[in-house]
Amino acid sequence: MRAGRGPLFLRRTDGWLLPLEVERWCARADPVDRDVLDRCEGTVLDVGCGPGRLVAELAARGRAALGIDVSEAAVEHTVRLGGQALRRSVFEHMPGEGRWDTVLLMDGNIGIGGDPSALLERVTGLLRPGGLLIAETAPEEVDERVRVHITDAHTTAGDPFPWARLGTRALLRYARGRWERDGQWTAGGRRFAALRSRSTSNSAEPAKRTAVISSQRVRNTCGGRPVPDR
């Protein structure tokens, strides 16, 4: 990640390798990415933001956006691109709980934690009622939960961690009951689905289309300009 190039893979315990598109992730947002961002509403939380191309593009558009990632290198790269980011798991406390307008799970990040149901439940707690989730799904119809290592095909880094791979149909199955379909599409060989939360907000405040990012805890390169903490 720090080098900005691969090859890197997720390696399953049976030896199967899933290539990671490090070069694309470390580049600027491409036309497919920008189309996704055009669909975002209000404040945007990019879960598993990686090197931050999407957060940086949103910031360049003047949008209130925050990336989160467990990788320090990813957070640092996001900041260098001009975005705002926190080193944090999606399952930890977030600024603006229950008030985000859009949550992104791009680049297969619906697999975070290896439990799609738990992740979708968590996202409902982050979004305002009726908030938008945009998820990038696997290019093929698959529904698997695995344990993986990050590897360059020769050596592995860190401990194994749980991951999931979902096609669009599998995602829609997991979403039944708590989510409404808001669209699905394919672009540039990539597949996406949009869902609307049906959950009620735990926040006592009404949903507002204003920044929900805490300036005390967010790394930023905005010359010290505060981002309102609602």
PLM feature segments, named:
Residues 1-39:
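S-adenosyl-L-methionine
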Residues 41-50:
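Conserved class I S-adenosyl-L-methionine
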Residues 82-92:
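Conserved SAM-binding strand-loop segment of SAM-dependent methyltransferases
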Residues 111-122:
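A short, conserved alpha-helix within the catalytic core of class I
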Residues 130-138:
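Conserved beta-strand signature within the Rossmann-like core of class I S-adenosyl-L-methionine
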Residues 160-178:
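Short alpha-helix
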